[in-house]
Design a protein with these regions (language model features):
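Short loop/turn motifs that connect adjacent beta-strands in outer-membrane beta-barrel proteins
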Residues: 20-28, 56-65, 91-97, 153-159, ...
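Outer-membrane beta-barrel "beta-signal"
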Residues: 410, 438-452
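Residues that define the transmembrane beta-barrel architecture of outer-membrane proteins
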Residues: 28-30, 42-46, 50, 64-66, ...
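Outer-membrane beta-barrel translocator/channel fold
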Residues: 59, 72-144, 272-305, 431, ...
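Transmembrane beta-strand segments of outer-membrane beta-barrel domains in Gram-negative
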Residues: 100-102, 109-265, 269
Length: 452
């Protein structure tokens, strides 16, 4: 509600503000915001977040010397976010250094199985009913990242290197609305059938090493109007932090991000974001599948594939596999620019179209055993129908999922961007005999920044 009131005040200011030249910001600049949202499964989110920018004498504006982002919030049914991020282009001469320390206490999070369309999605099971939450599990993540970047000569190319430590705690969902005596979930089903081995069923610790190259000709990183950005990097984790497992969870992955921006007149920018992230070698644990590794972290949560940080309008983490392809396309249309409370403001909207799919499956052979090696039995009921273990492997190969939507952005000094985005999935599974395969209704995101 506070965000909506603030937005209304900004809209009112637009009506009375005269056209003024953008001022060059100097020194410290603060962007506080209440963290408020609602989820039927998680409850109300309450807390606060703050962006701090240091512009120095203003000669680098709209770029910054350094920034800090912090957030502390909690949901009424138990989930919590504690986040601190630092990014500096001046702390060490010739280097860009960023650090992230975050705790995501996801005592209730979505789990829809592996390999997209291969895993049955039942809309009536996608909620807590009578103490049962079939598509829920727990996934806490304590994360620390340290990244360094440097230029290669005077070219637009650069190198990037970093480490990322993640400590995952997984298990059955913890939620006040669940009946702990009778609740049975898809996560439990996967553990019982060995699709998720017991040795990784409760989480683990991993130290990822990142190394790659970057190409960047954008005129501005956070709010570009033109240019190209390419990121290509390897990241992997040797499994030496998880004791004596009977097998190893070493893995090596490749991520490639391509971003392109074209100006279409003075007020419209077309942006495209094409991504591949996939396994090259090894055996990634199930709890790491939804971890999307960025170089420069624009959002606290970058999990996928699905939901607001990767594939808007779909159910969160709907697509999980060994390798993904996805793309985001949008038109960023500036509605108004004005000065208010000695800050540079802009209002923008961004109609968007997203698509993605699993291109290399994960533990598909094990999924085929659902209801086969053990006596098939009902594991869930919804809409007057019983669903058996064997129902949750459809035998389908994943195909392209699509969504579209619209956003409204309130941007201060070209960096602090309050985002309201609404998306709808188009993948209804009509060919497969069920509807709303990626979630029903309108997905909503209230947060910071464009997603790319």
């Amino acid at each position: 509600m506070k965000r909506l009131i603030s937005l209304a005040l900004l809209l009112a200011a637009v009506c009375s503000a005269s056209a003024q030249e953008e001022i060059r910001k100097t020194g410290l600049n603060f962007g506080p915001l209440p963290a408020v949202s609602y989820s039927s499964d998680l409850g109300f989110q309450y807390g606060a977040l703050l962006d701090i920018y240091q512009y120095g004498d203003g000669t680098v504006y709209p770029d910054y010397l350094w920034k800090i982002n912090v957030e502390a919030s909690r949901y009424t049914k138990g989930n919590s976010v504690l986040h601190a991020y630092f990014d500096s282009k001046s702390l060490i001469r010739g280097l860009r250094v960023s650090a992230d320390l975050t705790y995501l206490g996801n005592k209730t999070t979505n789990f829809y199985g592996f390999n997209g369309a291969a895993s049955l999605f039942v809309p009536d099971l996608n909620k807590i009913v009578d103490g049962h939450g079939f598509y829920l599990m727990r996934r806490d993540d304590l994360r620390f990242e340290l990244t360094a970047q440097g230029r290669i000569g005077s070219s637009h190319w650069g190198w990037v290197a970093g480490i990322a430590f993640n400590s995952y705690k997984t298990g059955h969902a913890v939620n006040k609305s669940l009946d702990i005596n009778s609740d049975y979930s898809l996560y439990d089903l996967y553990v019982n059938y060995g699709i998720i081995p017991v040795e990784e069923a409760y989480g683990g610790n991993h130290l990822d090493i990142k190394l790659g190259v970057v190409f960047d000709t954008r005129d501005h990183e956070n709010n570009p109007t033109r240019g190209t950005n390419i990121e290509a990097f390897l990241f992997g984790s040797p499994d030496f932090l998880n004791g004596k497992r009977t097998y190893r969870n070493d893995y090596l992955k490749l991520a490639i991000h391509f971003r392109q921006f074209f100006p279409l007149g003075d007020r419209v920018v077309f942006g495209a974001h094409l991504v591949f992230q996939g396994l090259l070698a090894g055996n990634a644990p199930f709890y790491s599948l939804q971890t999307i590794q960025p170089i420069n972290r624009k959002n606290v949560i970058t999990d996928g594939l699905g939901s607001y940080s990767t594939f808007r309008g779909t159910a969160a983490n709907r697509l999980q596999g060994n390798s993904y392809l996805w793309a985001n396309f949008e038109f960023r249309c500036t509605l108004a620019k004005f000065r208010w409370i000695n800050q540079n403001w802009a209002l923008a909207t961004n109609p968007f179209f997203d698509m993605g799919m699993v291109v290399v499956p994960y533990r598909l052979e094990q999924m085929k055993g659902l209801g086969q090696d053990l006596k098939d039995f009902p594991v869930a009921s919804a809409g007057g129908k019983d669903y058996f273990a064997s129902d949750f492997y459809t035998g389908r190969t994943d195909r392209l999922h699509t969504s579209a939507g619209l956003g409204l952005h309130v941007i201060m000094n070209q960096n602090f961007n309050i985002a309201f985005e609404f998306g709808k999935s188009f993948f209804d599974g009509y060919r497969f005999g069920w509807k709303n395969n990626d979630g029903s209704g309108i997905g909503m995101r209230i947060g910071l920044n464009y997603i790319f």
